[in-house]
């Protein structure tokens, strides 16, 4: 059932494709951007993802290699690219949002920028200043491959404005995905960024 929520997913990797599929199944109108034309063509032609066994991308997910076609007038924008590319993409997205209603922005990417030591949400806000109260992070002990397979998945959605967080949870969660609101955005981002470091360290010890 269509719900009139417009979604832009930036990055059609494992997390981007998984969340695009979940939101499309909820009835959202989903536009995904993928920089790799070969991957974009594969998703469009085959509706499968090489890293997600058994995954099917719903037919109502549109995939583009042109950013301006993926970011038209979204209610929800998901940033699901490698953290190294967040600043350049946020800078390119900013003019596409000018004069329009600001979407709820959710970072799925995790990482800290070299040199500035800014988190993904902080980078987004630096490049899109009016997004400060609407930029959130989704993080937790979760894996895209499990969510794509339909496994019950729980994560937190952390942001500075809890009213905005709760509105975004209503848009984003559904099916096997359950989200809990969180006020500590910085803590959530740092925890998500450092968890792999801790895992490697634990393995060495």
Positions of PLM-derived features:
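NAD(P)+-binding Rossmann beta1-loop-alpha1 motif at the extreme N-terminus of oxidoreductases
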Residues: 1-56, 61-65, 92
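Rossmann-like NAD(P)(H) cofactor-binding subdomain of soluble oxidoreductases
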Residues: 64-72, 76-79, 83-152
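Internal alpha-helical scaffold of NAD(P)-dependent oxidoreductase catalytic cores
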Residues: 85, 96, 123, 127-133, ...
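Cofactor-binding loop segments of dinucleotide-utilizing enzymes, especially the Rossmann-like FAD-
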Residues: 12, 35, 108-110, 160
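Hydrophobic anchor at the start of a short beta-strand
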Residues: 7, 30, 133-135, 179
